[in-house]
């Protein structure tokens, strides 16, 4: 598992949030809207077994934490497969089509699943474990820490 924490800094300091994308429904999305807010970026792919294992827990944790913005960043597949994944797991938060991998590259995501946890002060933690799915409890604990 790779865990990297960014040093606390002003919310406007993270240039990685200066991206634009397209939601799975075709609407524009601007990453800068996440500045200064607790947020979770979840990098996933529909064929990924760990992503499939995590998805129900991600859906529940997102629903239980309306004060934290969740954004899924899907890649390595076509939009139809991405939409089916979102529908299958009831992911009722914004999911982006990053088919070209540009947002993944911006965050140096080598493989899925991966997370970036943003605190309101702009500091962040990157978590990427290629050997197992994150448990719902670990995800819940990490999300709770964003508000403290």
Where on the chain are the PLM-derived regions?
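Thiol/disulfide oxidoreductase modules built on the thioredoxin-like
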Residues: 87-91, 99-147
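Hydrophobic beta-strand anchors of alpha/beta hydrolase catalytic cores
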Residues: 40-41, 70, 115
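N-terminal "domain-start" segment that seeds a small globular fold
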Residues: 3-31
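Structural microenvironment flanking redox-active thiols in thiol-disulfide oxidoreductases
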Residues: 52-89, 99-103
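Short loop/turn microsegments at loop-to-beta-strand junctions
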Residues: 17, 39, 112-113
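Short active-site neighborhood of thiol/selenol oxidoreductases, capturing the structured segment around
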Residues: 30-52, 58
């Amino acid at each position: 598992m790779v865990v990297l924490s960014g040093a606390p800094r002003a919310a406007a300091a993270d240039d990685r949030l200066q991206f634009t994308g397209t939601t799975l429904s075709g609407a524009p999305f601007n990453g800068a809207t996440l500045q200064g807010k607790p947020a979770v970026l979840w990098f996933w792919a529909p064929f990924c077994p760990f992503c499939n294992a995590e998805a129900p827990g991600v859906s529940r944790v997102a629903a239980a934490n309306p004060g934290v913005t969740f954004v899924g960043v899907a890649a390595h597949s076509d939009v139809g497969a991405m939409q089916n994944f979102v529908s299958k797991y009831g992911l009722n938060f914004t999911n982006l089509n990053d088919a070209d991998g540009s947002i993944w590259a911006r965050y140096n995501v080598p493989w899925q699943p991966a997370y970036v946890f943003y605190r309101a002060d702009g500091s962040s933690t990157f978590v990427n474990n290629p050997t197992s799915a994150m448990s719902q409890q670990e995800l819940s604990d990490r999300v709770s820490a964003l508000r403290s």
